[in-house]
Amino acid sequence: MLFTLLLSAAAVQASTRDEIERLWNPQGMATQPAQPAAGTSARTAKPAPRWFRLSNGRQVNLADWKVVLFMQGHCPYCHQFDPVLKQLAQQYGFSVFSYTLDGQGDTAFPEALPVPPDVMQTFFPNIPVATPTTFLVNVNTLEALPLLQGATDAAGFMARVDTVLQMYGGKKGAK
């Protein structure tokens, strides 16, 4: 029974890695820094560390990362996913910056900002526009990493965060 669970977990992780690799484009998204919103500074006072242990044992400071959410107020998948994301942000202490494609927020993120065209070009150069879509943005370098398109549950989202941060660490030579 345990062997079957481990085998199925490995298959899920492999498909997750394949999906992330399709989203991750070294000539596009991964190497192109996101631009801060007009009137904001990329550098602010550094928050206290919020350590998150990855499944490979490595620790990552979630204070170095921000989740950027692209959503729509009338999207049923956003209504399903956004409360999950908000709860995870509160639980793990990461911050979420929400953009709306239709000018409307939802109950989880009622004050989402309308997305400017240049932000759309930065985040969606080679992937389809869909909602919800999330990216991890390194607050120190403004490097944006594609995270997920579509709704998922809490465990699925955190597993994706784990996988993306492991892949990022491997590409950067971190241990």
Predicted regions and their residues:
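Extracytoplasmic/secreted cell-surface and envelope-processing proteins
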Residues: 78-79, 106-108, 144-146
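Structural micro-motif
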Residues: 120-136
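N-terminal post-signal-peptidase region of extra-cytosolic proteins
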Residues: 51-56, 79-82, 115-121
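Non-globular targeting/processing and membrane-anchoring segments
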Residues: 3, 8-61, 138, 145-175
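Typically the conserved alpha-helix immediately C-terminal to a functionally engaged Cys/Sec
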Residues: 79-92
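Thiol-based oxidoreductase modules, predominantly thioredoxin-like and allied folds used
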Residues: 94-117
